[in-house]
Amino acid sequence: MRLSDVLILTRARFVSATGSPNLEVRAGFAADLMSDALRYDLSGALLVSGLATPQVVRTAEMADVAAILMVRDKVPPPEALDLAEELGIPFLSTQLTMFETCGRLFAGGLLPCERCNGHK
C-alpha cells in the first residue's frame, strides 16, 4: 500500500516535510508501548501510534519502519519532527482513533506485521 492510500483511507495529512505519497508500506502495526513494537518485524511497515514523542521515532529507526501515523490528531513535538526528518521517516497524523484507523487500513488491504520469531 502506498502512503497516498493511507492518506485517503484515514483522512491523514503529512506533519513532516519528509515523505512521498508514493512511498510503499508493506504492512501495518499499532502500539503505544514501543517495547511491543520491537517484538515484531516492522521493516518497511507503517507504525500507527498515539505516542507523540521522540521515543516513537527512535523505535521506528531501530525497527526500520517506513512511516509513522499518529492518531487522535496528535502532532509530535518539534524535536520528534526534527529527528524524523533527519532520519528520513515520514510523519503523518489523522483525527481518527487508533481503532478506526486500523480498521480502515485493514479493510483497505494493509496486512499486519508478523512477530520477529515468525509466529503470528
Where do the language-model regions lie?
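Feature captures the catalytic cores and cofactor-binding loops of soluble hydro-lyases/lyases
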Residues: 22-23, 29-46, 50-120
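An N-cap/entry alpha-helix motif that binds or orients negatively charged groups
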Residues: 1, 5-29, 39
